[in-house]
Amino acid sequence: MSAQDVRSILSLPPSTPLPTLSSSKKVPVPRKPDGITRELYALIGDNAPSLADAQASLAAVKYREKPALKGKKVHWEWTKFTPAARRDNPVRLGHWARITDSDPNDSVEYFGKFNLHGPSVMEYSQFEYDQHLVDPNWTLQETEYLFELLKEYDLRFIVAADRYAYVSPEGEKRKRSVEDMKDRYYTICRRLIRTRTASDPVHQQHLIQAYAFDKAREIKRKQYASDLFHLTPAEIAEEEALYVEITRMQQNERRFRADRDELMRSVMGLDSGLVEVDQSAMENAIGVDKNKKKRKAEDESAAPSPAPTPKKPAPNAGFDNSRCIYHLPTPSNANSLTSHLSQKHPPHQQAFLRGSRLPLPKPTAAGRITDLLAELGLSANRLVMPTRQNMEVFEGLLNAAAALVEMRRQVNRVEQELRVVRMQKEGLMPVTTNPSARVKGEAGVVTGGSEATVKAVTPVKEC
C-alpha cells in the first residue's frame, strides 16, 4: 500500500496539489493561406471567403423535390357541342374539351353561361308610334328593322351600322350612318319617357338627360377630330408656334396685371386693378380744390353761352363694319354707365382688420361699458387672440354689456320717478305736472297744511 492510498483512506489532503486541467482551451488560429502576403492578410482578417467553406455550404443545400400531385386523371378529347346562342338554328361544332373521370360525357359548352343579353332596347306599341314617334325620314318598317338590329347587337351602334342593310318595299337600299341611327333611337327613347306616366319625376328627368344626343354637335366633333388627325407637318408646326405665342401673351398679361395691381396698391391702397372708385375720394387724393371748381362753374355760367356745335352725322353701318369701328352706346343719364359698371365690378373693399369693424358703443355709455368689462377682468381695447370666433364672441359680449348698461339706466330712472311720487304722496313736495322731474341737490320748501317744512332731498346720481 502506498502513501497515497493511505491518505485516501484517511481522507487526508495530498501532500502536493494535483495538476488541474486548464479551463480555457486554445483557439486554433487559422493559418495564413499561401499566395497572400502577411500585411494583406492582416487587413482582410476573418472576412476572407473560403472556397472550401463555400463548397461545403453548397453541398449542404438540398433542393426540394417536385411535389407529386394526387389529382384525378385528366385528358383532352375532341368533342361535339351545340352553341348555346343558336338554339333556333342549331349548328354542331367541335372543340377540345378536358374530360375528367368523374364526368367523361360532359359536353356542355363552358362559355354558354356567359352568353347574357346586353342593355335592353326600349319597346313601343303601334298606338305610341302613331301618336308620338312618326318621322318623315323614317318609316315604320325601317324603324322596326333598326330596333331589331340594335337588339341583336346589344346597342353596339358601330357594329349595327356595319351590318345595316335595309331594303325598302320599293327595292331601294338605304345606308344610315352611326349618327342617324343614334339620333333616331335616342329621340324615340326621349319621347317615350316624356309621354309615359312616371312615378318619380326626378328619375324621369334623369332618364331624359341620359338619352340626350345632339346629332349636329356629334358630326362637328368627328369632323374636327378628322381634321386634326390629317394635319400636315407644316400645319402642326404652325399650331405649335401659335400655342407658344399664346402662352407668352398669357404670361405677359399676368405680369402686366401684377404690375398694375402693385401700382394701384402703392398709390391708392387698392388690392385689385381696375375697380370703381369713389369720385370724392379721388378728388381728395389728387388734391382738387372744390372751391376753385365751384368758382369756375359760376364764371362759366356768367359767361355768354357759346354758339351751338354742329350736329355730328349719324354713323354709317357699312363704313364702320368695313373698318372694324364699334360705337359705344350713349347712356341716357349720367348714372346708367356707373350702374352698369357697378353690376360687372362691385364696389371695391380694401383690406381691413376684424377688430376695426366691431360696433362702437355710444360715447355716453362707453365709459360704463369699459368699467363693466374691467369688473369682469377683460380689456375693451384688444384681444390676445383675435380670431374669427373670438371676435364674434367679443362682439356679442359688447352688445350684452351695452344692453345691461342701458337696462341699469332705465331702472335708475324708474326708481327715481317712484321716489319722487312717494314724496309727493306724503306731502313733502309740491305736486308737479311732470312726475318724472329730476330732484337736484338743493333744499326744497314743501308746504304741508298750515306749516312750512324745509326738507333736504338727497340727490340721486343719474346713470
Curated annotation (Swiss-Prot):
Residues 130-189 form the SANT domain. Keywords: Activator, Chromatin regulator, DNA damage, DNA repair, Nucleus, Transcription, Transcription regulation. It is found in: Nucleus. Residues 1-32, 285-359 are annotated as: Disordered. InterPro entries: DAMP1_SANT-like, Swc4/Dmap1. It holds the Pfam family SANT_DAMP1_like. GO terms for biological process: chromatin remodeling; DNA repair; negative regulation of transcription by RNA polymerase II. The keyword DNA repair applies. GO terms for cellular component: NuA4 histone acetyltransferase complex; Swr1 complex. Residues 330-341 have a biased composition (Polar residues). Residues 10-24 have a biased composition (Low complexity). GO terms for molecular function: transcription corepressor activity. Its main location: nucleus. Component of the SWR1 complex which mediates the ATP-dependent exchange of histone H2A for the H2A variant HZT1 leading to transcriptional regulation of selected genes by chromatin remodeling. Component of the NuA4 histone acetyltransferase complex which is involved in transcriptional activation of selected genes principally by acetylation of nucleosomal histone H4 and H2A. The NuA4 complex is also involved in DNA repair. Belongs to the SWC4 family. Component of the SWR1 chromatin-remodeling complex and of the NuA4 histone acetyltransferase complex. This is SWR1-complex protein 4. It comes from Cryptococcus neoformans var. neoformans serotype D (strain JEC21 / ATCC MYA-565). The gene is SWC4.
